């Protein structure tokens, strides 16, 4: 997910960067068909990944479960591996364990906690102001204006404990060995989720785009979450669109450790680079900052493959 912040100039991509991404998986791709206009569709994105030696990606929609789409793409583009996911916004019933259960039965690999309907993310988005909004915020305002937008969602109660609906969703995630991704919830919610996931038997937890403004986790917080068992995700769009400095993201990766980090693009927006190119630009940035080829492969190939296949 990205707002309409002015992006930087594209980074020239070397053969070395493409080589480092051979066999890579992007765990957060926003392509079409979708409620929001996208730069590319599922099929063409899978073909572009294969053409560059990358393996596949996870389809993220803020609104709809993507398990069925993923199965069709994987069959239609031989050699690709595309996976589905679900995001627990109001369009799927919010923190709805039935939706999680059926996503698991459909082969979905990631369950994102609320994003566009997260109380942490929607604060100030739906009540006017701010001419520059994320694409999704415009849709949320339209739904609110039509009187069909329920209250924002939180995974914790006033005492900071996971709510019963959140716990029930985590139980379904554990049952199907899916990846719990923290979405756009706030700092206290992220820590509650990571701790609760361990208690409820969830084996794979991904802290979503750690530097994104609505999360804005410090290096110390990211390391603490990794110490609790989470993998920390860093997304290309966050830094490319100037929501966080590259140097901060690189420092956070070094502090947490490459072995507990994944890189994703969060791409697919019409105004941003193509998904495959953005992934390679991210790899190039890391290489230019002194990370090794092996480091990039760990974050783009080894850990994503393990998360998807275990």
Where do the PLM segments sit?
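An N-terminally biased module of ancient metal coordination in phosphate/nucleic-acid-related enzymes
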Residues: 2-79
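Histidine/acidic-residue-rich catalytic or RNA/ligand-binding cores of hydrolases
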Residues: 35-39, 67-69, 96, 191-196, ...
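Acidic (Asp/Glu)-rich catalytic clusters
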Residues: 18, 70-79, 101-107, 171, ...
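Structural preference for beta-strand elements that scaffold enzyme active sites
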Residues: 24-26, 56, 81-83, 109-112, ...
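Active-site glycine- and acidic-residue-rich loops that bind
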Residues: 89-95, 181-186, 210-216, 235-246
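Extended substrate/RNA-proximal surfaces in nucleic-acid metabolism proteins
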Residues: 93-208
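Mid-to-C-terminal alpha-helical segments outside catalytic/metal-binding sites
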Residues: 279-310
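Short acidic/histidine-rich active-site segments
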Residues: 235, 258-275
């Amino acid at each position: 997910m990205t707002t309409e912040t002015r992006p930087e100039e594209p980074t020239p991509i070397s053969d070395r960067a493409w080589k480092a991404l051979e066999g890579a998986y992007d765990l957060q791709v926003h392509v079409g068909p979708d409620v929001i206009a996208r730069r590319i569709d599922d099929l063409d994105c899978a073909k572009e990944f294969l053409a560059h030696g990358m393996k596949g990606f996870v389809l993220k929609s803020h609104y709809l479960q993507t398990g069925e789409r993923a199965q069709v793409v994987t069959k239609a583009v031989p050699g690709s591996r595309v996976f589905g996911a679900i995001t627990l916004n109001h369009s799927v019933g919010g923190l709805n364990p039935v939706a999680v259960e059926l996503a698991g039965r459909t082969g979905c690999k990631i369950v994102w906690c609320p994003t566009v309907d997260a109380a942490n993310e929607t604060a100030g988005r739906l009540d006017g102001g701010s001419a520059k909004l994320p694409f999704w915020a415009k849709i949320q305002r339209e739904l609110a204006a039509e009187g069909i937008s329920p209250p924002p969602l939180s995974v914790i109660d006033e005492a900071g404990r996971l709510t019963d609906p959140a716990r029930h969703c985590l139980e379904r995630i554990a049952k199907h060995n899916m990846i719990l991704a923290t979405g756009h919830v706030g700092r206290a919610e992220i820590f509650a989720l990571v701790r609760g996931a361990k208690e409820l038997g969830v084996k794979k937890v991904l802290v979503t785009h750690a530097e994104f403004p609505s999360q804005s986790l410090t290096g110390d917080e990211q390391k603490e979450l990794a110490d609790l068992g989470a993998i920390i995700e860093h997304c290309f769009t966050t830094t490319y669109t100037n929501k966080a400095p590259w140097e901060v993201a690189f420092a956070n990766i070094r502090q947490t450790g490459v072995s507990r980090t994944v890189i994703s693009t969060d791409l697919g927006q019409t105004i941003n680079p193509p998904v495959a190119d953005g992934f390679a630009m991210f790899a190039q940035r890391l290489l230019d900052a002194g990370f090794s080829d092996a480091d990039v492969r760990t974050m783009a190939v080894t850990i994503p493959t393990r998360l998807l296949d275990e």
